[in-house]
């Protein structure tokens, strides 16, 4: 049956994507709750830098305001810095799915796996609204995560997620 109706069966790739989604979701939600992100200033940019250094599978980490204007970003691999710098501060992301969905729903959004135009690697983009103390959306944080690198670290990340829940 699987041979003739493969859509009815979960593939290894589907399983890997689910795992990646779960792990990435834990990380981005935790980061989005950080109060430093709300001011869009030097504290926000410093927090993005330190977070991306902590998780080297992050390819690109970025913060926008509610209009989709890029406020700060962290590029983890120096080899890609020049390519990503084509997206300057103030770049308009307002028409991108990863920005629009959290603004419309107020919830985290996970995109399907795709090939990065900057690195050629398979990535998933996870985005989440950043809210103030009254739960008003003040911005959106997004992260492009290299699928291969995330899966290599999956066991350690699962342990970290369980520890955070306790």
Go through the PLM ranges and name each one.
Residues 14, 18-21, 52-70, 108, ...:
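Short N-terminal helix-loop-first-beta-strand/juxtamembrane motif that initiates sensory/input modules
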Residues 40-51:
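Amphipathic alpha-helical coiled-coil segments that mediate homodimerization
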Residues 38-42, 92-93:
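Conserved phosphate-coordination/catalytic loops
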Residues 119-158:
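Conserved beta-strands of PAS-like sensory domains
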Residues 111-113, 127:
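Sensory input modules used in signal transduction
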């Amino acid at each position: 049956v699987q041979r003739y109706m493969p859509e009815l069966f979960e593939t290894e790739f589907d399983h890997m994507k689910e795992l990646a989604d779960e792990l990435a979701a834990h990380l981005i939600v935790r980061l989005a709750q950080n109060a430093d992100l709300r001011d869009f200033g030097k504290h926000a940019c410093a927090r993005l830098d330190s977070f991306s250094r902590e998780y080297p599978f992050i390819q690109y980490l970025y913060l926008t305001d509610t209009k989709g204007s890029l406020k700060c970003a962290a590029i983890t691999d120096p080899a890609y810095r020049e390519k990503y710098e084509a997206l300057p501060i103030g770049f308009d992301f307002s028409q991108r799915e990863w920005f629009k969905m959290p603004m419309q729903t107020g919830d985290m959004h996970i995109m399907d796996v795709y090939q990065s135009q900057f690195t050629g690697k398979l990535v998933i983009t996870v985005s989440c609204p950043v809210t103030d103390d009254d739960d008003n959306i003040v911005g959106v944080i997004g992260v492009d995560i290299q699928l291969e690198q995330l899966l290599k670290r999956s066991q350690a990340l699962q342990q970290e997620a369980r520890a955070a829940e306790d």
